[in-house]
From Swiss-Prot:
Organism: Saccharophagus degradans (strain 2-40 / ATCC 43961 / DSM 17024)
Lineage start: Bacteria, Pseudomonadati, Pseudomonadota, Gammaproteobacteria, Cellvibrionales
Any one GO molecular function term: ATP binding
SUPFAM superfamilies linked: P-loop containing nucleoside triphosphate hydrolases
Family: Belongs to the RapZ-like family.
Binding site residues for ATP: 8-15
Superkingdom of this protein's organism: Bacteria
Residues holding GTP: 60-63
Alphabetized UniProt keyword annotations: ATP-binding, GTP-binding, Nucleotide-binding
Described function: Displays ATPase and GTPase activities.
Protein name: Nucleotide-binding protein Sde_3181
Pfam family name, one: PapZ_C
């Protein structure tokens, strides 16, 4: 039996994630009271051919605080030995949530006559802290389109069954904020910057000119060697601990040159030992026309 618990802040994409999982053959139950988890786990565990069943359960902040604080123990104490459970938490920045609710004009579940949108968002974050702490996977959807969210959930949650631990190398620009879903963050702003070469400024770390420039820098080789050695040393420990994913974020100033180049180079090296290695370039995806 495979059980996924999908939670997160309202507006972060929980419903969209459940719709995708339903398309992938999961039986989905949304807004389940946490205190009913043990009974549900027992019931689906006793069903015929239970080992082949796949369930996804949506849990939100409308549960009692005391119930949410017990979510980790409720799962651990009631899950059958032959079952697998993964808790996925979707997070989004306050600014993006305010924008999303303003644009859609949807009512926040915790807002009322006495609670405005800003206060409801802050209140929900506190209520869901026990779930966020218990999460096996945290996905920051602040900068994701619906298509990107579905692709990410499919890659990390649906696709990880047969491919083992997924290793994601994510490039980003520090000027746009640090990704909250990273397990490790490496700052490469100290490296020579192609941005200061006028002929390279408009290119990205995927293009030949930038690659040639960075390939010629000894500091870049040293940084690559050190990050690669770190990931290669510790990735087996994460995998042995039944982790389904490992996200390594590489950041430069604008997220266009150095971080992109290193993320691609690191992914190419790690693919020699791992079947499920991907890259994501946050700032490239946000360029006009991307």
């Amino acid at each position: 039996m495979r059980l996924l618990v999908i939670s997160g802040r309202s507006g972060s994409g929980k419903t969209s994630a459940l719709h995708l999982l339903e398309d992938e053959g999961f039986t989905c139950i949304d807004n389940l009271p946490v205190k009913l988890l043990p009974a549900l786990i027992e019931q689906i565990g006793d069903a015929p051919h239970a080992s082949k069943h796949k369930f996804a359960i949506g849990i939100d902040a409308r549960n009692l605080n005391s119930d949410l604080s017990q979510i980790e123990s409720l799962i651990k104490d009631n899950l059958p030995a032959n079952a697998e459970c993964l808790v996925v938490y979707l997070d989004t920045s306050r600014e993006v949530l305010l924008k999303r609710f303003s644009e859609t004009r949807r009512k926040h579940p915790l807002s009322d006559q006495n609670t405005g949108l800003n206060e409801a968002i802050a209140k929900e974050k506190v209520i869901l802290e026990p779930v966020a702490a218990a999460a096996d996977i945290t996905v920051d959807t602040s900068h994701m389109s619906l298509h990107e969210l579905r692709s990410t959930i499919k890659r990390l949650v649906v696709g990880e069954e047969s491919k083992g631990m997924a290793i994601m190398f994510k490039s980003f620009g520090f000027k746009y904020g640090v990704p909250v879903d990273a397990d490790f963050i490496f700052d490469v702003r100290c490296l020579p910057n192609p941005y200061w070469s006028p002929e390279l400024r408009s290119q990205s770390g995927l293009e030949a000119g930038v690659i040639e420039f960075l390939n010629s820098q000894q500091e870049v080789d040293d940084m690559f060697d050190d990050i690669c050695a770190f990931v290669q040393k510790w990735a087996p420990s994460f995998q042995a601990n039944n982790r389904s994913y490992l996200t390594v974020a590489i950041g430069c100033t604008g997220g266009m040159h150095r971080s992109v180049y290193l993320a691609e180079r690191l992914a190419a090296e790690l693919k020699k030992g791992y079947a499920n290695v991907q890259t994501r370039h946050r700032q490239l995806e946000q360029k006009p026309g991307a």
